[in-house]
């Protein structure tokens, strides 16, 4: 067993899980409170990356560009909610799926018109561009450690927001009983706009942190959206705690599985069979995990109270 590789892949799994959590936290709130299936959530992840790339170029600072990109993405999401999504709340889920799928196509063409078809890069400052020595001589990219730290901080702040504030009380109540908060005289449209904006900001944060380690390109949010939906189902729709735990589980299993499954299969089969089967099986691991968890807990690991 290569313990150095295992540690590196475990950290990579945590880093991937953190990005999944940021996407899943916003999307699970949107669906849990607004009962809206938003397939275009991955497009907000893409917009966050493009906003960060542009603002970093304009300001000459990645940190300043990232700070400005988060409220920009939140404002963008709130505008989208008010213009394009508000009429979908009374429609069935099939209509929501079709409409938000159309938004994916719209956002892709919108980005193509504004930024062109060629991908962008987000340059990192020198302090984040190197690696950090952890222990026993193991070095790990500094920016990936920053992603993990920022994700944990955001998870803690979300916990405080949801559990200790008036807005959080409304969010918890809305996730459990939307009719109740409406009967109490809460401005539902305003709450929905705030929740959607918060979800857009989280998606944008994930996008701007993913941008420096991959190409910022059209359609970059579509693949990760599918895994995000798996995270939400595993964790429990509407549950921030569930999204966090499930995201880390999925991130670790996906990353570590892809790295070590060929070697594990090689212990029982020939190298040719192991090399052929490992990619297919590794891509199935998170879906097998979802099936196993749903067989035991049909509402996910941590469903909201009253669900």
Residue ranges and their predicted role:
Residues 5-55, 83-95, 179, 232-240:
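Single transmembrane alpha-helix segments in multi-pass membrane proteins
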Residues 60-104, 110, 245-250, 254, ...:
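Alpha-helical transmembrane segments within multi-pass membrane transporters and channels
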Residues 87-164, 191, 256-285, 299, ...:
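Transmembrane helix-bundle core of multi-pass membrane transporters
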Residues 49-54, 70-76, 103-111, 150-159, ...:
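Hydrophobic core segments of alpha-helical transmembrane domains in multi-pass membrane transport
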Residues 60-62, 66-71, 193-203, 207-208, ...:
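Transmembrane alpha-helical segments in multi-pass inner-membrane proteins
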Residues 11, 33-79, 83, 264-274:
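Membrane-embedded helix boundary and interhelical linker motif in transport proteins
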Residues 1-22, 51, 59-65, 91-96, ...:
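Membrane-interfacial amphipathic/re-entrant helices at transmembrane-helix boundaries
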Residues 16-17, 137-221, 240-245:
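Helix-loop-helix "hairpin" substructures at the membrane interface of multi-pass membrane proteins
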